[in-house]
């Protein structure tokens, strides 16, 4: 029997299967028969042994009837110029992984991590792309790591393999990671079909969590590990809009495979995240995570946080120094009575008052007032390192190597904030003394006191 006659024989058995031709040619290739098209197979007069026909019949049955993935049946899969061994119980490499790696920008990248590496597809493809990279691959599955080691040998690359669950790998990696590439478990249990039933569930569904969980953790990781310059991940089309929205505070873009289908995202973390001042929900979430926001106030560039210790670390400032509490008008009722009495005469405005050793101010800007009404009271200080002056433009912080490594984000306002780059006047109500002021501020301050006949 010729190969083509055998093809026709099996075609009749599986004629309802649209992918039969491709599957048949792939199996033939596994046994050393190289035919790119059925036409070339037809022109061939090569014979096939009965022993081999029995093997191929069994493989076709397992694939089309029992829905066992072809790479498991053949024991290998070819992705362009890369060869990977496969094994039941270990996630099968996909061609889309190469599209992810094709999107990598290697500028300033020295170290890379394939998170949830499985059989090592992304790590190996990345090392092949740039041999000078220091590449790590981590996975919780020891069987997957053993297979990854074999695949690295097959493809003649050296990778650092780590057995670790998810972010635990960072405890074992002693060098900062510049790039993370990952194809994390992102499916719902309801999305598992018969073919996927043969693949390990932990590679498909993330720790019995929802399909969004892994990406939310990756989002948080970029915010807290500022050394990570780039994140590239695979996800499903159903998650596209939600993830584009989640990562919109970073410079990010979608990734498409070689068939122009959406398969994932590329996120640049080399600049500080940017959040619109009207996006109060996100700003509040980031502040709750322990980050600080850089915002243009009515006086200077300000740094706001829910935590005084966060501000201390960023500003490299001596501990136990107090910061100004800044808030919206809705918070006035919670202030000491003395402050409430004079509030309407000076606030909103560039006046800071100290009462009971605590400092308070309400800014004179509608955007800031709306923000603070939504997120509540924050600690505020000038956005500068101790003994240095703050910048006058938000963009300056994005070009400063110190600031882009800090746990900060930019709060962007479309309206023009009237900032004069002069700190607010500070008056201590307890000691009745001006603590900080300029000649111009002092004149205006006393003018208001006289006008309203205030006894402060």
Swiss-Prot record:
Residues 277-440 form the YrdC-like domain. Gene3D superfamilies: DHBP synthase (3.90.870.10), Vaccinia Virus protein VP39 (3.40.50.150). One of its GO terms (molecular function) is protein-glutamine N-methyltransferase activity. It comes from the Bacteria. One of its GO terms (biological process) is translational termination. This is Uncharacterized protein MG259. InterPro entries: DHBP_synth_RibB-like_a/b_dom (IPR017945), DNA_methylase_N6_adenine_CS (IPR002052), N5-glutamine_MTase (IPR050320), SAM-dependent_MTases_sf (IPR029063), Small_mtfrase_dom (IPR007848), Sua5-like_dom (IPR006070).
């Amino acid at each position: 029997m010729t190969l083509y006659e055998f093809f026709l024989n099996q075609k009749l058995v599986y004629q309802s299967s649209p992918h039969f031709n491709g599957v048949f040619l792939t199996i033939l290739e596994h046994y050393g028969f190289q035919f790119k098209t059925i036409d070339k197979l037809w022109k061939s007069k090569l014979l096939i042994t009965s022993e081999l026909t029995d093997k191929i019949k069994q493989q076709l049955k397992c694939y089309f009837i029992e829905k066992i993935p072809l790479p498991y049946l053949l024991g290998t899969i070819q992705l362009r110029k890369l060869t990977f061994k496969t094994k039941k119980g270990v996630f099968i490499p996909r061609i889309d992984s190469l599209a992810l790696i094709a999107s990598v920008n290697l500028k300033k990248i020295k170290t890379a991590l394939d998170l949830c590496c499985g059989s090592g597809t992304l790590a190996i493809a990345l090392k092949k792309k740039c041999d000078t990279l220091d590449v790590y691959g981590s996975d919780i599955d020891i069987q997957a790591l053993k297979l990854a080691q074999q695949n690295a040998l097959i493809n003649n690359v050296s990778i650092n393999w780590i057995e670790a669950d998810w972010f635990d790998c960072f405890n074992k990696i002693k060098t900062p990671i510049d790039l993370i590439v990952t194809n994390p478990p992102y499916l719902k249990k309801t999305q598992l079909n018969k073919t996927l039933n043969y693949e390990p569930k932990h590679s498909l569904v993330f720790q019995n969590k929802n399909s969004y969980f892994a990406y939310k953790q990756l989002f948080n990781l970029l915010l807290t590990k500022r050394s990570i310059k780039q994140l590239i991940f695979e996800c499903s089309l159903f998650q596209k809009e939600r993830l584009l929205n989640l990562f919109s505070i970073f410079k990010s873009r979608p990734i498409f495979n070689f068939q122009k289908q959406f398969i994932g995202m590329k996120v640049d973390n080399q600049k500080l995240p940017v959040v619109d001042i009207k996006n109060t929900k996100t700003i509040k979430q980031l502040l709750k995570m322990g980050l600080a926001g850089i915002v243009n106030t009515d006086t200077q560039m300000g740094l706001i946080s829910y935590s005084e210790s966060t501000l201390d670390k960023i500003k490299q400032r001596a501990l136990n120094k107090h910061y100004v509490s800044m808030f919206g008008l809705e918070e006035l009722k919670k202030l000491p009575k003395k402050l409430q009495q004079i509030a309407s005469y000076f606030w909103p405005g560039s006046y800071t008052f100290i009462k009971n050793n605590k400092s308070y101010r309400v800014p004179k800007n509608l955007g800031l007032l709306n923000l603070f009404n939504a997120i509540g009271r924050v600690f505020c200080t000038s956005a500068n390192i101790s003994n240095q002056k703050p910048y006058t433009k938000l963009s300056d912080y994005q070009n400063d190597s110190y600031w882009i490594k800090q746990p900060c984000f930019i709060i962007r306002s479309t309206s023009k904030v009237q900032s004069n780059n002069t700190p607010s006047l500070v008056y201590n109500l307890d000691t009745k003394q001006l603590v900080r002021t300029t000649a111009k501020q002092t004149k205006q301050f006393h003018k208001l006191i006289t006008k309203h006949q205030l006894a402060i």
